[in-house]
Amino acid sequence: MPRSNRNDNFIDKSFTVMADLIVKLLPINARAKEAYVYYRDGLSAQNDGDYAEALENYEESLKLEENAIDRGETLKNIAIIYMSNGEEERALETYQKALDENPKQPSCLKNMGLIYEKRGRTAEEEGRRDDADGWFDQAANVWTQAVRLNPGGYLDIENWLKSTGRSNVDVYF
């Protein structure tokens, strides 16, 4: 039974009903509609913390989805699950796949930077200054791209870039 048919949350159920109506009315093919149902069920499972079910639904959605922007969004959600589970390398690989599908996803770049920055802090705490600088430079690189895609949207990142001396003047408007 699809997750949407067993949702007890009134708001989620209302959203699902409205989304189903919109999908039925849109002039899209059956394959795209089915991909959306899997995506929506994956999102619902992810929001409930059922990551295994979410991943299953997202994988099914990816098998059907042909739109690069929608594929990128699905891959981003998969990467978020990997990141939440501490699977940083898989998360980075999946964020990159999401960006390959849709390069205009600043949140993928932001999250990749979080992983690099965390690795930099760990290396710094362990006294590996050169490694730390390398990780911080990688964080700065992807964060600079994120800020360029979403100016003013990541003030904390902009502040980090400035405070660490890794900012580029052309990033800020």
From Swiss-Prot:
TPR repeats: 35-68, 72-105, 120-153
InterPro entries for this protein: PSI_Ycf3_assembly, TPR-like_helical_dom_sf, TPR_rpt, Ycf3/AcsC/BcsC/TPR_MFPF
Listed GO biological process terms: photosynthesis
Keywords: Membrane, Photosynthesis, Repeat, Thylakoid, TPR repeat
Main localization of the protein described in the UniProt heading: membrane
Matches recorded under PROSITE patterns: TPR, TPR_REGION
A GO CC term assigned to this protein in UniProt: plasma membrane-derived thylakoid membrane
Signal peptide (residue range): none
Membrane topology annotation: Peripheral membrane protein
Protein name: Photosystem I assembly protein Ycf3
The gene coding this protein: ycf3
